[in-house]
Amino acid sequence: MLNMTDLLIGTRLSTYARTLNLICLHFESGDGTIYCLHSQCLLRIMKDKSLIASSNDVYNPCTAFNGDIDEWDWSEQVGETLYDEGMKNGLSEALPLRVLSVSFGKCGDIFLELEQGYSIEIIVTTVTDDESWRFFQMLHAEEITFVYSGDESYSIGISNPLKPVTVPDIAERSTGLAHRT
């Protein structure tokens, strides 16, 4: 059975992007397959246990900003936020970075350990049924998608209905969220 852990370990974080407050991380396998991890909750990028960038920083101007903060609109400032600055200065030149380990918290949190002392933490911050993060294979006819929303995680496939997996089950196994559909 394939799971998110099996799919991510050994891949390399190759690129990142964001659309408003949706953070997109792309992981490339040795055969060129690209897996995407999209976060709509708290995401932290660390280097040797120091914070490089946080998804909360998309709402703050970069350090070079010298205008009126009351007129600054984060939604119109792609590339000019404190998050963008942290990613550019703290992560860009280190890419690609190999994924060494993947673990999960009790509430659907994800912890990725990368080479060179980097790590990624995705922390679910809501009790609602809103989607917190999504993992999928890019440009693939048989979609592999893992979604964390509320108290359950789902494996979504083109030909299969949603299949729930409870969060306590995830925490006990610490191996992934669902299976390939």
Locations of the language-model features?
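Surface-exposed, interaction-prone regions used to assemble/regulate multi-protein complexes
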Residues: 1-181
